[in-house]
């Protein structure tokens, strides 16, 4: 929720005016992101706008800006969106620890065009199945017509009925 709120705040900043401070901070984030895990875009923009240059966050940015003239162009909004929604390294490791979130993260990371059906199959496997215990006296037709009766239980019922019929025939023939 906190990240969503921060993103909303940043988007409101970008929608009003795309100033040079915002462009400089985005450039700095793109250049220094692997080196600085604690880089905060909001703090960088505030420090730039207030001209608080000797701060520990803005000093490496000024060095990067002086070293290279690479900047984001205002005509490339996909770079701005990518910079806004790029999670930090600490957030990435936290997400990779959780197995369910890890699978969602991998799907977002590498979307393949032909894998939509596999995603639907995986979702069906994770759905909770509602089916009750079946009594021994219920008929096979009643159970076969129920919507929530699982395929596994149908197979079990058929196998149990076949084995009980075999036992009866063996018992009647005197082989048991």
Swiss-Prot record:
GO cellular component: axon terminus; dendrite; extracellular region; neuronal cell body; plasma membrane; synaptic membrane
Predominant place of localization: secreted
Pfam families documented for this protein: Opiods_neuropep
InterPro entries in alphabetical order: Nociceptin, Opioid_neupept
Tissue expr: Predominantly expressed in the brain and spinal cord. Also expressed and secreted by peripheral blood neutrophils following degranulation.
Maturation-removed propeptide residues: 20-95, 169-176
Signal peptide: 1-19
GO BP of this protein: chemical synaptic transmission; female pregnancy; neuron-neuron synaptic transmission; neuropeptide signaling pathway; sensory perception; sensory perception of pain; signal transduction
Subcellular location field: Secreted
Keyword tags: Cleavage on pair of basic residues, Disulfide bond, Neuropeptide, Neurotransmitter, Opioid peptide, Secreted, Signal
Keyword Disulfide bond: yes
Gene Ontology molecular-function annotations: neuropeptide hormone activity; opioid peptide activity
Modifications after synthesis and translation: Specific enzymatic cleavages at paired basic residues probably yield other active peptides besides nociceptin. The N-terminal domain contains 6 conserved cysteines thought to be involved in disulfide bonding and/or processing.
Record family assignment: Belongs to the opioid neuropeptide precursor family.
Name recorded for this polypeptide: Prepronociceptin
């Amino acid at each position: 929720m906190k990240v969503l709120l921060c993103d909303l705040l940043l988007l409101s900043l970008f929608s009003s005016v795309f100033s040079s401070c915002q462009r400089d901070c985005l450039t700095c984030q793109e250049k220094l992101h692997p080196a600085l895990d604690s880089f905060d875009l909001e703090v960088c923009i505030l420090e730039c706008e207030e001209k608080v240059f000797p701060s520990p966050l803005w000093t490496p940015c000024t060095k990067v800006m002086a070293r290279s003239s690479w900047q984001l162009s205002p005509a490339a909004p996909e770079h701005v969106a990518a910079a806004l929604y790029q999670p930090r390294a600490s957030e990435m490791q936290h997400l990779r620890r959780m197995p369910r979130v890890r699978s969602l993260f991998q799907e977002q990371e590498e979307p393949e065009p032909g894998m939509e059906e596999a995603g639907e199959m995986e979702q069906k496997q994770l759905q909770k199945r509602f089916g009750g215990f079946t009594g021994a006296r219920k008929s096979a037709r009643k159970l076969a017509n129920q919507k929530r009766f699982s395929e596994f239980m149908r197979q079990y019922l058929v196998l149990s009925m076949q084995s009980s019929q075999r036992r009866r025939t063996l018992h009647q023939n005197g082989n048991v």
